[in-house]
């Protein structure tokens, strides 16, 4: 059985599935992001509860990420009146609720959703987060039946270099 231990950054203590993964060591307290405003804190707390169990919260200067084995969801620095949450799946979801969907080769899709009220964290979002949490557990690595969409639909945002590689017939996961 392969070693499934996580690498721990010796500077900040954050953990990762691979050695020396790019990250920010500018670790902050959660209050540095959410401040004293009870409205966004209530939305954040409901989002964390919807993640379905204990997760590691990695709070850095520009974002907060949620992790089981790998990072599977998070929020950008809060806006004045809303949170911009994201979650990772191995398939794209087409929904008017989503602000954007970005493709990351070979088969990851980062979905972004605006959360302004506690009610925005509803059953639909909770179901997406449950699937995303399984990606965080790396079920897609061990389950051969797990769906992996390697060709992004035209409505998904694709980085220019990745789109060029796809157009040439190259492996887009080799683009750095």
Would you name each region that the model predicts?
Residues 2, 107-162:
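Well-ordered alpha/beta subsegment
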Residues 4-6, 19-22:
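Residues immediately within or flanking Cys/His clusters that coordinate Zn2+
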Residues 9-12:
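Short cysteine-rich clusters marking metal-coordination/redox-active sites
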Residues 16:
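Cys/His-rich microdomains that often coordinate metals
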Residues 21-37:
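A short, surface-exposed helix-loop junction/capping segment
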Residues 38-55, 129:
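Amphipathic alpha-helical segments
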Residues 45, 58-114:
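Short, conserved beta-strand/beta-arch hydrophobic-aromatic motifs that form part
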Residues 156-176:
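Acidic, Ser/Thr-rich low-complexity intrinsically disordered segments
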